[in-house]
Structures are given as C-alpha cells and as structure tokens.
C-alpha cells in the first residue's frame, strides 16, 4: 500500500485543524492528541480512549512504525463499527480502515512514524499528520468504501479472516482476554481494537498482539498530559537534544516508555515487532494466506499472544485494580 501513488483531495477543515493544534499544545504527543481531537469534534466523552492511546506515540511504543495519526482513528472506527458491520466476507472496518490508510499515505507518503518525523530534533514533520488526521477520519467515517481494497487482496483477506473466525482468534482481542477483559463486560474495548488483526487490517505491519499490549498499558496505568508550559518544555528539550522522554517531562512518557520496553522484550522473543516478518507471510497474496493456514502459523500466534499478555501482566503487577471504562 505504501508504494501506491495517490493524490490527496482532502478539503481543509480549519475548525478541526484548530482544535487539533490546541490539543497538541496541551498534550504534546501524536496519538493521544489525535484521539482527543476526534472525541472533541464528535462530542464523545470517552477519556478512557485517550488513556488507551497513551503508549502509542512514536509509532506504537516509540518503535517508529504506524503513526499515531493512523492508530487513533482506527481505534475510533472500531468504536463506530466493531466487527459487527459486514460487507460480503469482511467487516466494513477493513474497507474504511484501508481507505483511511490510503488517504493518510496520499497526504504524508507513508504510515511510518520514523519516515514522517525524519531526523530533525524539533518534530515539525509530525505536526501535519496530527492536524489532518481528524478530517481524514471524518471523511472516511460515513462513506462507502466497498471498492477500497483491490479484488485480489480482498479475496486473500476474506479467506484469512474466515480462518481466524473459525478458530476463534483475533490477535488484539486475544491479549485482552488473557489480561482479564471480556467481550460481554467490556464490549467497547473489544470494538476499539477491531482493526488490530494481522498486523493492522492484515497489512502485516506491527503485530496486533503487541499493539494490544501497549494499549493495555496505557489503559490501566496511563496518565493524561494537559499543560501548555510542560509541552513547551518538552519541545525545548527535544530541540536541544536532551532527554525529552524522561517520565517527569510529559505524563504520556511513562506509558510510551513502557511500550518501548515491551517492544525490546517482544523483539528478543520473536525477532521483530512486524507481523509479516514474524509469520513469513504476505496476507495480501493468496499464496501467503495459504502458507499461513497450511503450515498452522496460527498456533504460534496464539502462543505469542498468551506469552506477551503474561509479560504485560508482569509489568503492571503493581497496578492491582483495573481502571474502569
């Protein structure tokens, strides 16, 4: 997807951009800012979603992969549609999520945080994705995107999705279940992670079990930054090359740093945080899906989800009570 040449035709919405900029000045990190901005624009009171995104800045636990300007809108598409709304053989979140990613790439040429931010100390390249993501989300939310996924890829995705449903497995939801959540008691939480399957909508990107663990860290123990002076200090420290991610600098830093520590453990155990690298399968290709199914790669995915949930639980052992939604 990231090699496709697409033209951005997004009409600017200055009210959305103004709201996003105001939130960015108070919060300082991408994923929580985008989450807060879309919640504000949608008049939704769900602060738990901001906590859920607390560890996601820097490309999911500061690993440099999917930008927070993508992951937060995908969470909110899940809240809107879950896996309940189905178009043919796939939930509509695949159509909408794919369309959202296409539009994001049209604006920013990539989904990857590290490619967007570059090597500049001051994160000036991160500002446009934060400002534009809410209007991309709103543009995608109620549209018809049934043709967004090319037919060949859609057939491959449909076969893989049927295989996972038959085996009652969803990467992100499996981690949540191991952490003590349940679809019956926490339906919105399970909806929120709908897109995080097969490395984000079967795109083979960041392992969705890992993503769910980082989200759980934020949900259970995350704090929310809301201070312009503290964000100015954060940016100043970044610009001069200091340790801007010290946990005393910004309240989101603790969750992000925990996510990064989880990433180091995950990479040691699995060799990568990237689904396609771990599985050795390209899910957009029917041959890749056949490889995954016929060689029973699912068994390893189930084991990884279980073991990673145990690691997350260890990290949060001092957090004895669940944070209510």
Positions of PLM-derived features:
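Polybasic, low-complexity association/targeting segments
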Residues: 1-26, 131-167
């Amino acid at each position: 997807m990231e090699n496709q040449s697409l033209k951005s035709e997004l009409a600017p919405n200055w009210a959305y951009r103004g709201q996003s900029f105001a939130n960015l000045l108070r919060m300082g990190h991408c994923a929580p800012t985008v989450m807060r901005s879309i919640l504000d624009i949608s008049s939704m009171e769900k602060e738990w979603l901001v906590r859920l995104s607390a560890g996601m800045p820097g490309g999911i636990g500061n690993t440099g992969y999917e930008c927070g300007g993508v992951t937060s809108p995908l969470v909110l598409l899940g809240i809107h549609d879950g896996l309940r709304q189905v178009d043919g053989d796939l939930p509509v979140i695949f159509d909408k999520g794919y369309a959202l990613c296409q539009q994001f790439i049209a604006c920013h040429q990539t989904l990857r945080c590290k490619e967007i931010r570059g090597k500049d100390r001051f994160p000036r390249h991160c500002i446009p994705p934060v400002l534009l993501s809410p209007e991309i989300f709103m543009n995608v939310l109620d549209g018809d995107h049934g043709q967004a996924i090319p037919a060949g890829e859609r057939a491959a995705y449909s076969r893989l999705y049927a295989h996972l449903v038959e085996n009652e497995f969803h990467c992100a939801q499996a981690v949540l279940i191991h952490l003590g959540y349940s679809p019956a008691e926490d339906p919105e939480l399970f909806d929120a992670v709908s897109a995080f399957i097969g490395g984000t909508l079967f795109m083979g990107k960041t392992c969705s079990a890992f993503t769910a663990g980082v989200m759980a860290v934020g949900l259970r123990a995350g704090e929310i930054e809301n201070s312009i002076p503290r964000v100015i200090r954060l940016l100043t420290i970044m610009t001069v090359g200091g340790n801007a991610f010290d946990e005393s600098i910004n309240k989101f830093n603790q969750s992000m740093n925990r996510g990064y520590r989880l990433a180091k453990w995950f990479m040691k155990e699995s060799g990568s945080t990237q689904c396609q690298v771990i599985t050795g399968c390209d899910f957009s290709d029917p041959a890749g899906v056949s490889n995954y199914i016929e060689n029973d790669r699912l068994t390893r995915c189930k084991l990884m989800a279980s073991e990673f949930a145990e690691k997350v639980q260890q990290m949060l052992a001092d957090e004895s009570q669940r944070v209510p939604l």
